[in-house]
A protein has these predicted regions:
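NAD(P)+-binding Rossmann beta1-loop-alpha1 motif at the extreme N-terminus of oxidoreductases
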Residues: 1-61, 84-85, 120
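A generic structural signal for well-ordered alpha-helical segments
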Residues: 25, 104, 148-149, 189, ...
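Hydrophobic beta-strand scaffold residues
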Residues: 32, 48, 110-112, 196, ...
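Rossmann-fold NAD(P) dinucleotide-binding segment
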Residues: 52-110
Length: 287
């Protein structure tokens, strides 16, 4: 029997994130039906369905949080999705999300994709900073706004079903770059009498001070002029590459996290972009 209620939903997938999502809805008073390949992972209070098909049939709102796009398709394949609101919180690419939207729609369902900007411990925690990008069917988003706001903040980025995935991966990519820089920095100080615990606050403060550069990059991309307002141009920055590389060599640290970006900087200068900021590198990546 299907439940048409804004206080009931189904969750497919009970990994760390799926379990955290489920617990947040249970704590908010929702009736949650769950399915997982290992039913023993079900949080206390959830109703465990024997099959994915049974779980989907139970509620109109179905949240999917599985390993990848292939797992989503394998789980939903052959299940009647007529009248179902499928909210996919599985990490995917823009193209995968768009294709999955068509796949779900062709089977009678409505589709909303999501990109979770949080780790499981942040889910359901007030003021944790957690939020989810959503994109896809506007009416689905509006109809389920209350339920979707329970685990984390909501940022709806448009009707294109691929946009949530793109925002998600773009920000994760920026984070990967930050992690790479931090790894290199900690490696540099590793041989010296410098406490990582004392160094960490300096790194955080410096990264925060530099983070605003993104606004300048965005403005330059919008204008198409990469030289306006530049204080340290690309040619000047490239001259420091040698110092960074020599320091790494002296400290016995591999520079493999730095050299790909340095190569792009040098290439842009060689092509005449020496007076630009690092924004010019964006064009090289888009070619």
């Amino acid at each position: 029997m299907s439940v048409y209620s804004n206080k009931a939903l189904t969750v497919l997938g009970l990994g760390d994130m799926g379990s955290a999502l489920t617990r947040s809805w249970l704590a908010a008073g929702y009736a949650v039906t769950v399915w997982n390949r290992s039913p023993r992972r079900a949080p206390t209070g959830a109703t465990v369905a024997a099959t994915a098909a049974t779980a989907v049939a139970t509620n109109t709102l179905v949240v999917v949080c599985l390993l990848d796009d292939a797992a989503v398709r394998a789980t939903l394949d052959g299940i009647d999705l007529t009248g179902r609101d499928i909210v996919n919180l599985t990490t995917s690419t823009l193209a995968e999300a768009r294709a999955l939207s068509e796949w779900i729609t062709a089977r009678g369902g409505r589709f909303l994709d999501g990109g979770i900007m949080a780790v499981p411990s942040m889910i359901g925690v007030a003021d944790s900073g957690a939020y989810v990008f959503y994109s896809g069917a506007t009416e689905l988003h509006e109809a389920n706004a209350e339920a979707l706001a329970v685990p984390a903040g909501v940022n709806y980025v448009g009707a294109d079903p691929g946009f949530a995935a793109l925002y998600d991966i773009a920000l994760l990519s920026a984070m990967w770059g930050m992690f790479a820089g931090a790894a290199h920095a900690f490696a540099l100080i590793g041989k010296e009498d410098i406490s990582p615990m004392a160094f960490a606050p300096l790194m955080v403060a410096y990264q925060q001070a530099m983070a605003g550069y993104a606004y300048g990059t965005a403005a330059q991309l919008a204008r198409g002029d990469y030289t306006e307002g530049v204080e340290s141009n690309l040619a000047m920055m490239v001259t420091t590459n040698g110092t960074l590389l020599r320091t790494a060599a002296e400290q016995g640290v591999s520079a493999e996290l730095l050299t790909p970006f340095m190569a792009l900087m040098e290439r842009r200068v060689a092509e005449g972009g020496g007076k630009e900021s690092t924004t010019g590198v964006v064009d090289l990546l888009r070619r």
